[in-house]
Amino acid sequence: MKRTNYAGRTSEEQIGQEVVVKGWVAKRRNLGGLIFIDLWDREGIVQLVFNEEEDQAAFEVANQARNQYILEARGLVRARAEVNPDIATGKIEIEVKEAKILAKSQTPPFEVQDDVDASEDLRLKYRYVDLRRPKMMNYLKLRSKVTSIVHNYFDNNDFLDVETPELTRSTPEGARDYIVPSRVYPGHFYALPQSPQLFKQLLMAAGVDKYYQIAKCFRDEDLRGDRQPEFTQIDTEMSFAEPEEIQAMAEGLIKRVMKEAVGVDVPTPFPRMEWQEAMDKYGSDKPDTRFDMLIQDVSDLVKDSSFKVFSATVADGNFVRAIVVPGGADKYSRKDITKKEDYIKRYGAKGLAWVKVTEEGYNGPVAKFLNDDANALNERLSAKVGDLVLFVAGSFHVVCDSLGYLRESIAKELDLIDENKFNYLWVINWPMFEYDEGFGKWIAAHHPFTMLNEDDLKYLEEGEDPHQAHAQSYDIVLNGNEIGGGSIRIHDPEVQEKVFKALGYTKEAAQARFGFLIKALENGMPPEGGMAFGLDRWVMLLAHADSIRDVIAFPKNSKAVEPLTAAPGTVDDEQLEVLHLNVEEAPKEAE
């Protein structure tokens, strides 16, 4: 039988017509002489009705069918006696005249329904079953819709879709590369790209002018949160473009995706916020602007405080900053606040000072030190009776990171965030360099090919401090999540050489690693820039999904393992031999 339409697309317009549908048994109810089956396919569910008196053969097929069996059924569409408002086909059903079991199924490892009681690893092991759950299939359909819009948008704006290599040279961009040994050249290795960054710059040197690609990227980094070792980005580059042109291009794409894929109109242009303001007010370079509770500096008000933690911090050139939790005095106990204090110690905070605002003044561990300054503090902070005020003292990043975390975690706990909002924001004027505590050195805040602000080029000269420089870079933020970023690129080989030097590369090391780019810069590289969107994270936010893994068909788990195929796995000795590799067994941990 040839399928006439998707089960989930069967409609009232087909009442009285004969249709053929095929799909999985989502539910089966045997009422004696009648059997009802909910047949599912990617478009939804339709109810099949099998009547023993009307068609014995079809009824017997339904009698043998079980959950997740695959059926094909031919029958007449008719109106349902009782409408089911929970499904799109709830006004009709199919009276089956002929049916056949196309495939049987073992008992599923978990219920194939949206509210599933199963571990994530079990779901990933049977991902092909997990994806039959309606919301999971809807995530894939949304992702497909977004990528379709992306292709159409860039095609209509004169961009060329150009593929770049996935086997290339190792040029680490902050994270570790995944390396691939060469059989032909023993001891030599390819690397999987962390991004198409260098190749898209070379495409601009080639005269492509406007490039885009939906690209796979790979980073061998320690997993945290929702990060994946392989991920997908919407990559773009434009020659002879100013930052405003690139941002307008991105806003046009976002506006169209929001309208066509999500049904939401977002106003453009998006707000712009300088990196410094984002850090000062939100404690984050990806601020969530859906709620207030802004960070405020009170260093000048407490510099002479009898509370030595505050006064000594300010005397050392550091900061005392605070947030006000509206109505928090009754909502957070001393025990609750201590838990918050313990958490922010991971950011380097020495402690968390707090007071509750009462009619009589401040109440709390440091109240006796601050009551003399209460009026000035309350005026600065707009604190009212019943509020909780949290203070952190320390260096710029300690204070920002700690209060940024407190701001976001408390907003979630107090339900201060409107989850239906989509607040897009540009964060601009980033520092060119940042100090990485893990690596113990200065690194590029975005990447080493980012062009500095024209006024800051002087900081690359001998005797100047390059770490004061700011870059022509910009991130696009949605609801406190970075979903993309970009910059104007360096097109002058002399400037590029100075940036490499500021990052600690010798001339020889820079030539060995990036010689091909330097050569391109010396052979007619146009002024250019671009950006990239993280497709996985963007779709996750549009779908209101719980995890980035929900919007990827076959993701890795939080340990970078794919339970379905048990990757990564071992290979046999013959494969290692032809690659001229030996594997040394890692020593066991001491017990």
Swiss-Prot record:
Residues 197-200 are annotated as: Aspartate. Gene3D superfamilies: Bira Bifunctional Protein, Domain 2, GAD-like domain, Nucleic acid-binding proteins. GO terms for cellular component: cytoplasm. It comes from the Bacteria. Catalyzes the attachment of L-aspartate to tRNA(Asp) in a two-step reaction: L-aspartate is first activated by ATP to form Asp-AMP and then transferred to the acceptor end of tRNA(Asp). Belongs to the class-II aminoacyl-tRNA synthetase family. Type 1 subfamily. This is Aspartate--tRNA ligase.
